[in-house]
Swiss-Prot record:
Belongs to the ribonuclease III family. GO terms for molecular function: double-stranded RNA binding; metal ion binding; ribonuclease III activity; rRNA binding. Gene3D superfamilies: 3.30.160.20, Ribonuclease III domain (1.10.1520.10). Residues 5-127 form the RNase III domain. This is Ribonuclease 3.
């Protein structure tokens, strides 16, 4: 194993049984036909699975849409490129001459792809548990930060609105079904959320009373936050 690959292994905290896999993972398509694109494809799928698994365990109250948004934040190209920079993957990339001259080793897309390829290489070399351990280590700080920031956002809109009002000693909101339309099996509910005499009532719409109330609460909270921003200008 070359000195460069040794340094990268130390950064990763993982030693390859087959160093050729790591070399393959850092070889860009501009350098040779035998490049990291297939490993990138594999690593992308494994990374998405592992992050989904971490989030599923860490956010037991989160709904599917919320989990998807959290995962998207953790696997987007900018995040992967940041991780690649922390590992100094760019220093070891094997690039074609043109890509090297144009600074490809700094390019977000190339770094993100190489990071995914490294994940794929670790999977082929050491299996899923080796990958899980590596991803857990690399993402530890981000997962902890995300957990702290996301706990409030994972609360349902009615809870967030109630807590916002209580913190300011405002009256609690009142929800009233103002209209129901559609057939019995396909009804649409309209709910009116009344805050107090200072703010106008807000209308929410949903396929159930609960969803309409949540929609109304979301709109009411947005109104309150916008009003608060205007007062602070």
């Amino acid at each position: 194993m070359t000195d460069g690959l040794e340094r990268l292994c130390r950064k990763l905290g993982y030693r390859f049984a087959e160093p050729a896999l790591l070399r393959h993972a850092i070889t860009h398509r501009s350098a040779t036909k035998e490049n990291n694109e297939r490993l990138e494809f594999l690593g992308d799928s494994i990374l998405n699975f592992l992050i989904a698994d971490f989030l599923y365990s860490g956010f037991p109250r989160a709904q599917e849409g919320e989990l998807s948004r959290l995962r998207a934040t953790l696997v987007k190209g900018e995040t992967l490129a940041e991780l690649a920079r922390e590992l100094e993957i760019g220093d070891h990339l094997i690039l074609g001459l043109g890509e090297l001259k144009s600074g490809g080793y700094r390019r977000t897309s190339i770094l993100a792809d190489a990071f995914e390829a490294v994940i794929g290489a670790v999977y082929l070399d050491g299996g899923l548990e080796a990958c899980r351990k590596l991803v857990s280590s690399l993402y530890r700080d981000r997962l902890e930060t995300l957990t702290n920031e996301a706990l409030l956002n994972l609360k349902d809109p009615k809870t967030r609105l109630q807590e916002y009002l209580q913190a300011r000693q405002f009256p609690l909101p009142d929800y009233r079904v103002s209209a129901v339309s559609g057939e019995a099996h396909d009804q649409v509910f309209q709910v009116e959320c009344t805050l107090n005499n200072t703010f106008p009532s807000v209308i929410g719409i949903g396929r159930s009373r609960r969803k309409a109330e949540q929609d109304a609460a979301t709109r009411a909270l947005a109104l309150l936050l916008a009003e608060n921003e205007d007062m602070n200008v």
